[in-house]
Amino acid sequence: MGDKANAHPGAAGRATAADHPASVRNVVLVGHSGSGKTTLVEALALTAGAVNRAGRVEDGGTVSDYDEIEHRQQRSVQLSLVPVEWDGIKVNLLDTPGYADFVGELRAGLRAADAALFVVSASDGVDGSTRMVWEECAAVGMPRAIVITHLESARADFEGMTRTCAEAFGGDDPDAVIPLYLPLHGPQGPDGHAPVTGLVGLLSRKLFDYASGERKESEPGEDQLPEMEEARNRLIEGIISESEDETLMDRYLGGEQIDFGTLVEDLERAVARGVFFPVLAAAPAAEGARQGIGTVELLELVTGGFPTPFEHPTPGVTTINGKPREIKPCDTEGPLVAEVVKTASDPYVGRVSMVRVFSGTLRPDETVHVSGHGLADRGHEDHDVDERVGALSTPFGKQQRVVTHAIAGDLVCVAKLGRAETGDTLSAKDDPLLMEPWEMPDPLLPLAIEAHSKADEDKLSQGLSRLVAEDPTMRLEQNPNTHQVVLWCLGEAHADVALERLRSRYGVQVDVVPHKVSLRETFAAKSGGRGRHVKQSGGHGQYAICEIEVEPLPGGSGIEFVDKVVGGAVPRQFIPSVEKGVRAQAAKGVAAGYPLIDVRVTLLDGKAHSVDSSDAAFQTAGALALREAASDVKIHLLEPVAEVTILVGDDYVGAIMSDLSGRRGRVLGTEQTTGSRTLVRAEVPEIEIGRYAVDLRSLSHGTARFNRAYARHEPMPPQIAERIREEVRAAS
């Protein structure tokens, strides 16, 4: 680990394909936007020798932020893979966006990784969304470590931030969150700020000074020993308390000096088991320096303490018919099981799929089975196809290095899988398998869009289909009631990136229009109507008269048609014609142009002509009768109501309840959950929650999540209904 007093192992440059799973580490970087994840990846790449000079986010020169959108916004918006090699180990660094709108990219990174580095700014602290991701990792036992960045800030407080991390991440055992190093400070400047120039190794009792631009090891001074020993004892006690050797604590308390090698081995095992969470510090390299502060120590932790892919259980696997299939973890000779964790479009090579291989070995030019199931509700139809694998490559940001194979445990990019989408399983053609999907948040911000011009109409459908194939946190809806094309996103930033990609990648200009909800109409009371369609001015005429009664029904009843004609007043062959006309008019609406629902229409009487009556005439009469019945009674305008479930921190429950009240919501109940959070259930009109995905984030400072489901339609308040009717009249 970084505390081992060994010589610098040197850097082997950019990593290529791994030859054995034991020589791979898959690590995802997690943290809020601006915490320094991308800068840290750049510093690690420099220390490992993968780059000769570290780029800056502000200049658009980093390896992992290579998209033009990322350059303009100066933040990550997608998952990026940067493999480096350290001490003979290939380290796949997965840089993820920190902004909540791009949580789908984060979840893909978590799926592909075997361990996580939580990056925390020394000056900004831990936000609510980072805490929630930590809890998700804890639930599945993913090993984690914490890296404190922005040590150069005048507001940086390493000791205070370590305590904050212990409180935020330690749960019932805050002593499991302990630093392996303390910052080493240089001389104070004129402003009184003493810059961090290196680290104090607690286990090794060594100083690691980076002031020269490269790590140099030395002994601590007498004045540094008291603070070091106090922190060292806390660290040793923390390691021993998590040791699998139950005699170690007794020996330590009995005065035995536990040797350095035993402590390091126990530390590494505890980290790999996901029960001990070391805190490290890191800072980017200064101009001209070869190594950033703490980067050597961090690479040693990753290669020595983080688990190999052998220790990562394979997610559940079934046959495509749903029969469970036992797959040995990371068996390079086993059946092929791989998963597409990211899909991107390259202007030169077409679709590129980033794949994590869980079992077997993937090779170019092989035919594989591509299977995607379980996302039909998001516009991803179930699909099973055979496809030929194109070239395999190891990515380094936007660059690609061709490789000959990818073994179980490794990550690789596959070219030209035309049907594969994010989340799909790749398996052998003659042994098709399916991995259980990972959990993705529902996109809850609707974006109604239209092609800007005729020339854009054909390209829009193709562009949207590709976007949704790449990003399973987007959902495409063609609403048959409002006749709108709606792209559901996770938030405004997510929507902005989607629009920009439509324009820049697919050459589609779109207009964003107000999103409409699916309103309905119904009768407030019983009413009758007579439809008379008579035209007899010579030649073959039209003759149809019908009388109906309309009465309201309970919600969810739809349109019920009843025939009570006696004596053949309406010939039997024309009764279906009346019903067809009634249903056609109901679909168009009878007041404000919204479909009519939840009524019973009873045909009572009518008249026909032996020559001039026809199917078309009675359809028209049926429609006229329904319109007349509507003119004599109050028509309710119905709005859809959603059942909303909100998980929010206890501190924000009051604000959430007050906001729901302002949205005409009805709180159904609350329920206390774990982690000082409350589950709030409410019913809210859909017209009031169009932007709730954005507003809730603001109300809860990013700590709340919600889901919504259609409950029913119910009458709108009269003043709101009248406003909508006026808008309809003004538009007609």
Identify what each model region corresponds to:
Residues 1-732:
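Structural and coupling elements of P-loop NTPases
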